[in-house]
Amino acid sequence: MRNLAVFGTASDVGKSVVATALCRIFSNAGLDVAPFKAQNMSNNSGVTPDGLEMGRAQIVQAEAARVVPTADMNPVLLKPNTDTGAQVVLQGKAVANRSARDYFGNTEVWAEAAFESLERLTGRHDLVVIEGAGSCAEMNLYDRDFVNFRTAKEADAPVILVADIDRGGVFAQVAGTLSVIPPEDRARVKGVIINRFRGDSVLFDDGIRILEELSGVPVLGVIPYFRGIHIEAEDAVPLQAVVDPAASPDPGKISIAIVYFPHISNFTDFAVFDLLDDAEVHYLHHPKDLADYDAVILPGSKNVRGDLDWMIFMGWKERLAEYRKRGGIIAGICGGYQMLGISVADPHGLEGEPGETSGLGLLPVHTLLKKEKQLFNAKGCLFDDTIPVEGYEIHMGETRLTGKASPLLQLTARNNRHSSDTDGVISHDEKVFGTYFHGIFDGSAFRGWFLGKLRPDSAVNDTITEKDTEYNRLAEHFLSHLNMGKVYEIIGRGK
């Protein structure tokens, strides 16, 4: 059995979704398949069962493949924390902050670790679906790019090239990519997938013929643009998300406003709300009258003090204070929780210049950023209650309660070890709360508690069932439009 690589003509052409679909298709066919991406750049990350950090996109692909996610599936994770720099997570552990220039100055250390992980994966699974990064033909970085063709060569993997017809110029995308890469890499490209087609695909039959004549590579499928299949986005708030809407929230739905920080992270915490027919989420850059929203959530941030400064500059502090006075419900997750407090101190300069920044003052807590990152899968229940909660923690802050409020959660386990710690804080009137738990809304019990505070008649879906259903729907969509017989031929397995 050969491995298979999915590369793109550009960023955001749909590589992650194609890889996710293939993982579920191969899994449904009875194959032991695993995902792999040598290097991912994203602030959406999760924690593996053994307490290591990896990109959410590969966790999603592992779920689609029905395998336990491991850090080997995403050995290098870059988490941008400034416009020109990022925290480097190597095989699940944060090792350094690097500027782009420093990182690309010597990529061999990262490549070596990535290929170690790849070797372990290929030894454990029948098939590895490899996702590339960005464009596979960035010629100015080609000699330092270990994520695309160098990984394909290491895995002896044929390549499927994904192009996005929705953005236009699909012929130039494919022909241009294939014309600039070296002949030995071009020879690895065995098929093309045209993604996000709108309209009657029969009208593109001539386009398929022209593409195949131009490239000498078969078109394996034309995948129609789809809506209504909910798969977590990889590294940006999805384009279909409602950002800064001119219209007010729908009064017939539960309306949740999420503050869209410049350095927002783990916005996938809120993907579950997209599965609720009677809920809508608005991502807001700009402050507005919040009176019509049932709740406001401050998400995670990869630069808490920087985003705090941004919020104050934009006028968010005053808007949230007004909303609080009117009895609005405000929640903070991880970095958002830290912002709700009195202050955030960074004496080591982990996220910028050393110093301390005043918070929003909505919870009586102080946060100190420390050098060691905390990575936990955790379980517990609401404090003084039996409502179960699960989530994962990824933070470098230690937050102390210093005033009149109560812990939000009573923990029972962290990384499968007993814990009697508490997490988070909730105000005495239960209108403002914060927690370090990412994924907390995925649990139906906690989600029901939260939605019940907003509107008592809120319906609750089962997230796990929904997720599996969505992966199967995605696989069915691709199976209807993809020549899987040719794909199996490409990987050396007749079907």
Curated annotation (Swiss-Prot):
Active site location: C334, H438
GO process annotations (BP): cobalamin biosynthetic process
Domain of life where this protein originates: Bacteria
PANTHER family, per database record: COBYRIC ACID SYNTHASE, DETHIOBIOTIN SYNTHETASE
Pathway(s) the chain acts in: Cofactor biosynthesis; adenosylcobalamin biosynthesis
Protein name, entry field: Cobyric acid synthase
Secretion signal, residue range per the UniProt entry: none
Keyword annotations of the record: Cobalamin biosynthesis, Glutamine amidotransferase
Origin organism lineage: Bacteria, Pseudomonadati, Chlorobiota, Chlorobiia, Chlorobiales
